[in-house]
Amino acid sequence: MRRTWLRSAALRRGTVCVGPRARFLRASRAMSMDGELQKHYALLLGIGSPWEVKTVALKLAAKEVEIELGWQWGAAAQCPECGGPCSIHDRAPERTWRHLDTMQFTTLIRARIPRSQCPEHGVKTMAVPWAAPQGRFTLLFERFAVDVLLASGSVSQGCELMGIGWETAQEIMRRAVERGLERRQLEGLKHLGMDEKSFKRGQSYITLLTDLDQSRVLDVVEERTVAASEQLWATLTAGQKQAVTAVAVDMWAPFIQTIEQQVPGADIVHDKFHVSKYLGEAVDKVRRQEHKELMAQGDETLKGSRQLWLYNPQHFSAEQAAEFSALKDLHLKVARAWAAKELFSKFWAYQSEGWARRFFKDWFGWVSRSRLKPVIEVARMLKRHLDNLLTYLKHHITNAVTEGLNSKIQSLKAAARGFRSFRNYRVRILFFCGKLNLYPL
């Protein structure tokens, strides 16, 4: 009796050898558990015939789960080109795909994909249900990565959360943008915007084409030349360009020339924010010239007043408002320049083209007699483009949407600490600002 009890205790501790029958039972239980684990991962992956989970290996040291998938030989094969039935030629070398993590363990899928022998298309690597052709990630991982990158404050933060490198993230975004551009519908475009954005140091620019109604970037090209502008418009079909009714743009000659050639039926609308910028720069030139003259006489009246002349008085503090009011009463040249700028803002409120023309004529006459050269130069430029200023009264569009997207693009550039490659810059802009359908099917 005591011998039986000791043997049972030893068996529980695993300190004695067991017989063939016990070893067989243990192996059977292990095989049963492996089978259940394989079924479990097959369900998680959505894998079914003719594919099956062959093995699941847990690598604790590497913190990885490795899943091997296999093709059930004898199953019907299809050509990836035409979808027709065909025979199996051979198997391609083993490939690995990154999948969603399992309990914080990196999960990898391994498989040798069969290659089909099609009478029409020859030998082709067959498509797999868990990943796109030539992809290095499963469809589920790519979808997750897109969500994380869009939600993260920066790409580097998204990379850290997913445990991937910058180049991997860039590749995921590139593939997502390619998918999005292929699916994008551009019918019904009406109001577009064109604007420039600095790319690198010096005179290096990119040109953006934006859909003002949908607040999205349609495409980006390098430089701001006529050729670059034509390249942008070439992304639209003749029918899409014909539907465009107006384009908001500044007074950059290559942009105007290209719009007139590519979309002759659309009105050019010179953006009121750019006009305000030109007038603001003229006011600042007058201030700097007058400040220099006053300082030569020992007068520091305009010292430290730059922001007061450029910013909206509605946002002034009580102290700033009092200081600005006192400066305006001193009959300074810069005060007259500022008054000309503020007066022109009334132009945009007119509903009648005739009354707007009359206002501009009066404003232009007053400015011409002001003897303020920087303001006069801007007034003459506005007169040359008056017809395209008046189109605002018809369409009421501005490049405010484009400017808002420019701010977002600037934040992308700052987060990346600049871009050496325009290709990567374009992918990043379209990924975050293109409103594309980025997800894999």
Predicted regions and their residues:
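Short, positively charged, Gly/Tyr-enriched micro-motifs
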Residues: 2, 14, 21-31, 83-86, ...
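Short alpha-helix plus adjacent loop in nuclease-associated cores
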Residues: 275-296
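Acidic/histidine-rich catalytic cores and adjacent linkers
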Residues: 17, 23-33, 76, 81, ...
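Short, polar/flexible loop-turn hinges at active-site or ligand-entry regions and domain interfaces
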Residues: 128-132, 242, 266, 290-295
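Short metal-coordination and nucleic-acid-contact micro-motifs, chiefly zinc-binding Cys/His arrays
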Residues: 72-76, 111-114
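Long C-terminal interaction/binding lobes of large macromolecular proteins
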Residues: 29-66, 71-74, 140, 161-246, ...
